[in-house]
């Protein structure tokens, strides 16, 4: 898997670093995944992991790691993971060039 296929922005890396530091656990990594659901067919999910699975692709921004499993990877190739703060609240978002449609809030998509 090409390590340049996904990008973790500086904003997202800074937020992960902040959350990781608040937990006092430098081993935490951001896991990004795709699951069925949402109004457009697929949804993005985010959680923290302490270990890398055998089928994970690993992407790095400074001292922050982002993990994507092999199934989700095929839907996320070329995507940019960012962190935004706005009227809708603060959240991680995925700018996915593979998505043909997205819902209004951007949390689900179809291909």
Swiss-Prot record:
Signal peptide: none annotated. GO terms for molecular function: 2 iron, 2 sulfur cluster binding; 4 iron, 4 sulfur cluster binding; iron ion binding. The keyword Methyltransferase does not apply. Pfam families: Fe-S_biosyn. GO terms for biological process: iron-sulfur cluster assembly. Keywords: Iron, Iron-sulfur, Metal-binding. Coiled coil: none annotated. Binds 1 iron-sulfur cluster per subunit. Its cofactor is iron-sulfur cluster. The keyword Phosphoprotein does not apply. It comes from the Bacteria. Iron-sulfur cluster binds at residues 39, 103, 105. Homodimer. Belongs to the HesB/IscA family. Required for insertion of 4Fe-4S clusters for at least IspG. This is Iron-sulfur cluster insertion protein ErpA. It comes from Acinetobacter baumannii (strain SDF). The lineage of its organism: Bacteria, Pseudomonadati, Pseudomonadota, Gammaproteobacteria, Moraxellales. The gene is erpA.
């Amino acid at each position: 898997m090409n390590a340049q296929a996904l990008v973790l922005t500086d904003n997202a890396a800074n937020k992960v670093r902040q959350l990781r530091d608040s937990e006092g656990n430098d081993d935490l990594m951001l896991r990004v995944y795709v699951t069925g659901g949402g109004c457009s067919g697929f949804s993005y999910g985010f959680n923290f992991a302490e270990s890398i699975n055998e089928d994970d692709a690993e992407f790095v921004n400074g001292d922050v790691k982002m993990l994507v499993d092999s199934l989700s990877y095929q839907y996320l190739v070329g995507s940019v993971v960012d962190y935004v703060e706005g009227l809708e609240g603060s959240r991680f978002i995925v700018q996915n060039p593979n998505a043909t449609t997205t819902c209004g809030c951007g949390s689900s998509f179809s291909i």
